[in-house]
Amino acid sequence: MVTVTDFPKPSDEVVELVSSLIRFDTSNTGELETTKGEADCARWVARQLEEVGYECEYVESGAPGRGNVVTRLAGADRSRGALLIHGHLDVVPAEAADWSVHPFSGAVSDGYVWGRGAIDMKNMIGMMIAVARYLKRSGTVPPRDLVFAFVADEEAGGRYGCGWLVENRPDLFEGVTEAIGEVGGFSLTVPHRDGGDKRLYLIETAEKGMRWMRLTARGRAGHGSFVHDDNAVTTLAGAVDRLGRHQFPVVLTDTVSQFLTAVGEETGHSFDADSPDLDGVVAKLGPIGRIVGATLRDSANPTMLTAGYKANVIPGSAQAVVDCRILPGHAAQFEAAVDELIGPNVTREWITDLPAYETTFDGELVDAMNAALLAVDPEARIVPYMLSGGTDAKHFARLGIRCFGFIPLRLPPELDFAALFHGVDERVPVESLTFGTEVLERFLLHC
């Protein structure tokens, strides 16, 4: 192994890399006409890697400007399955007037890098680039092939990003058996049952399914002044009300059970699935409790209503869109409950269908995560958890790839990490970036 040291360490480069990445406005509105695209940012990423000797492939995924970059570093044992390290270049839009700094400034101040994407997820993109550059410059050969993928459109479901790549360019991921990406690896500080604090590092091993459902009610059109007993708006409103107010039962998956058991061991709290106050106990975890609480049960949140075109015309139809988040292995039960709630006079159709995902919390890759974290934070304990949202892991899982959320960040206990996702004044601590870069480097050397 080459030990030349006349080039920067990953931790020397990561802050400037993340700041530079944020300065690319890669806002994704969800509409091609108004989305800026990732092309300029993707080409910049490619230049950072090609500068040190990587061969990168730039791919536009289904639409002009939706840029992706993929490269591979050969490992010592080519017979082993490759490891994919992936991150998305797009970000959600930001309204500059709401921020204390410009959201695309990449400002470095008060110990933080500020801007849209600092947490979601240009922090990891910067860490990936920094470590990849170091491995190439040093001539380090990892134990297995590493595939680095920087992709588009995650914030809108990946149709013009990972979804397209998996469908049209699966060759880019040939031989990949495992993957790491968002959202996991961050620390959660909890009060220890014997006093003091304990840092848990949450490794994502599961995601709820994301299915957007359109409800349609049909009735008899007519004049608004008449008595009317077949009003589509009234029928739809009743169905939406029943669905939106319904609390689905608690179902603890393996991942959530393991998470609650680990937290209980450290804090002394009891997380009983049959307790009527389970939600209240989970809320004691602080800000992360919002994420964990959302993984205890299925959910169906009405988000859009459409009906009518004039105040005095009773429309012949009315529609609603419902954001459904479904636990792994629970789709059939969820659909049966929905059908009962909406009733026979409302039809449903799925307009987006990204299935749930869950893997086990074991194996050599999990051991490597644990070892890398313990080497930098001897007080670390890793625990599995489920993400209530969705990531590109849903697409990669279709290729048979075992996916984890692992972006190592040691966070200040007082930082409301969950609120920074898509939030105003999104920022990442500089110390968290340097910590994460060191952990990621160690992990990739022993993966």
Residue ranges of predicted features:
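Short pre-catalytic strand/loop immediately N-terminal to key active-site residues, enriched for Gly-Thr
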Residues: 109-120, 380-383, 424
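Solvent-exposed loop/turn segments at secondary-structure junctions
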Residues: 29, 91-92, 153-156, 185-187, ...
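Short beta-strand segments
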Residues: 86-87, 150, 180-182, 216-218, ...
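Metal-dependent amide/peptide-bond hydrolase catalytic core
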Residues: 1-4, 9, 185-206, 210-441, ...
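Acidic/His- and Gly-rich active-site-bordering loop/insert found
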Residues: 2-116, 135-144, 322
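Acidic/histidine-rich catalytic neighborhood of metal-dependent amide-processing enzymes
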Residues: 112-113, 119-202
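Sec-exported extracytoplasmic/periplasmic mature domains
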Residues: 22-26, 50, 54, 133, ...
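Beta-strand segments within the central parallel beta-sheet cores of soluble alpha/beta enzyme folds
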Residues: 59, 143-151, 178-180, 230, ...
